[in-house]
Every structure is written in C-alpha cells, then in structure tokens.
Amino acid sequence: MGKNKLGFPLTYSKLYEYYDLLSTNQDEIDRKNRFIDKILSQYKVKTVLDFTCGTGAQLFGLKKLGYQVTGVDLSPFLLKIAREKSRQKKLEVELIEGDVRETQVGSFDATITIFNAIGHLTKTDFETSIRNVHKNLVNGGLYVFDIFNLNAMTDDAIKNLAMDVKVITGNTKIYHNQNSEINRENGRLTSYDCFTIEKEYDEPKVLKDEFTLQIYTAKELRKILVRNRFEVLGQYEINGSKLLEQETMNMLTVAKKS
C-alpha cells in the first residue's frame, strides 16, 4: 500500500473474486450514476477519468451513456475483474494499474473517485491526490467524489453501518460480519470484518481483518479543495438531494479546477 497507512478491505485483495457480491448494490450504483451523469451533462463533459475504478461500477455505466472513459485503480485484482467485464459487456475501455496520488494519464473533462475511495488515504495523501487530479484535468475540468460525512456519524449511524450478510455463489457460501467504531477527534472510521467461506467438501475458512477510512466534514472538504486550487461548485447527498451538513451520511462534492 506504500504511503497509505489506513488499509483496504480484504475484498480488494485476498477475496477480490467476491468483491461485487459483497460490496456492490446495483440499485445504489444506478442511482449514483444517474446523478453523476446529470452533473457531467450540465457541464458538457465528454471525457472522464475514473481514478478509483475498482471493478467498473461507474466506468461501464458512464460508458453506456456515451462518455469516453478511462479507468485507473491501485488493485490489480479488481482491474482483472474489470477487464473481464469489459470483454463480457463488449464495452472497450482503457484500464490502467495506477495510483491516484501520482499516476498521470492525460487531460480529462472530469475525474471521479466514488464509493468512499478517498477515505483510504491519509489527510496528507488526500491532498497529494487532489493535486494530481488537478494535473489530469483540462482547465475548468471537474472533480466529483463522495465520502462519509463526519458530522453525521452519530452513535446510531455507526450502529446502522453494521453488516451481517450471507451470499451464495455456485457451491460456495460466504458469511460477512462487519462492525465499526469512530474516533471523532481525528475523523477515522475503523471497520472490523469477519468472513467465513464455506466451500462444498472443504473445511470452513475464516478470515478476519480491519481497515480504516479517513472521513471529513463538508466544511473541511471545502477548505482542502480551495487550498489546492479547486473551486467548490456544490455538495449534495449521494442521490442528488440537498446536503444537510449535520445529517447527510454520504456526501458528494463537485469541484472545478481553477
């Protein structure tokens, strides 16, 4: 992970083949993509760099809508799935293994980092990534990203993040339990995962791990973006409704390169 000290979920590496089963919800993806499309259309965006593309949740959705898209991700495992999806869907996209903090791909009308991706970066690395995003945008280009809202992380909200799910794929059963806790002083949300993998004729396999997300208030994000030569155009709930700074759990920020 290099400079990143917060860690990643096991579904980014050891359990990558189960990422889409355990970490994605198509209805949620479609809602996000509709709002992202609305923003991009408003600013007449044609080219999009998804700097944390994962298995392609936004990448392929935007490609189908007619955008020229390029995907970058730090995980070779998730990119492997994205490449297979590209073949299956017959959607040709450029996919690059790289790091939002330092990879330079070109000049795009917009860059996106979705699904709390920036939370895996320390505050210092987040600012480094913003400066690199700036380098990958045309003049006036957009940066669109989401992250949990620190102000909305009440005790009840943390409890509601808990997961206890079971999924079945072929002859494999996967049980995923997750609980989280927050340090409100430093804005770090730590999640504790337990995965139980049951394959036919094999002994159950149990994997435990933890990872931390650095989260922010809306005000913090505005200050950081301005400090790194971005103009904040708007902040919203992830579904496109008005941001409530003390209540919105997952906020989406739209900024313009200045």
Task: Give the predicted meaning of each segment.
Residues 147-219:
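SAM-dependent methyltransferase
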Residues 127-139:
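A short glycine-rich, Lys/Arg-flanked "PGG" loop and its adjoining helix->strand segment in the class I
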